Amino acid sequence: MANQEQIIEAIKEMSVLELNDLVKAIEEEFGVTAAAPVAAAGAAGGGDAAAEKTEFDVELTSAGSSKIKVVKAVKEATGLGLKDAKELVDNAPKVIKEGVAKEEAEKLKEQLEEVGATVELK
């Protein structure tokens, strides 16, 4: 049986298509999913109703006139592939990131607005 280092070296040598097939095979074999878990906002027991919101959804409402720059910015911010980022921008309004901290949400909003996008924090 291969040790951990040998497995990692084998993975490093794989193409993106081979890695995609590997992930699918692992999902089927072990009955798991490779999707990242989405952090759900926990209910605060007896929390103050006026408490400041700590998690935000960043929604792209419009790509504006610089769609190519917006697609690149969305791709960089989300880690999506070029095709998926373009599809997300083409289908605006869409949520780009969910449940992010206020600072990160504001930073992402600023980055997207710099390239001409219209963004809302919800």
Swiss-Prot record:
One GO cellular component term: cytosolic large ribosomal subunit
Subunit: Homodimer. Part of the ribosomal stalk of the 50S ribosomal subunit. Forms a multimeric L10(L12)X complex, where L10 forms an elongated spine to which 2 to 4 L12 dimers bind in a sequential fashion. Binds GTP-bound translation factors.
Family: Belongs to the bacterial ribosomal protein bL12 family.
CDD domains, per the entry: Ribosomal_L7_L12
Single Gene Ontology MF annotation: structural constituent of ribosome
Entry protein name: Large ribosomal subunit protein bL12
Alphabetical list of InterPro entries matching this protein: Ribosomal_bL12, Ribosomal_bL12_C, Ribosomal_bL12_C/ClpS-like, Ribosomal_bL12_oligo, Ribosomal_bL12_oligo_N_sf
Gene3D superfamilies: 3.30.1390.10, Single helix bin
Keywords: Ribonucleoprotein, Ribosomal protein
Function as written in the Swiss-Prot or TrEMBL entry: Forms part of the ribosomal stalk which helps the ribosome interact with GTP-bound translation factors. Is thus essential for accurate translation.
GO BP terms, alphabetized: translation
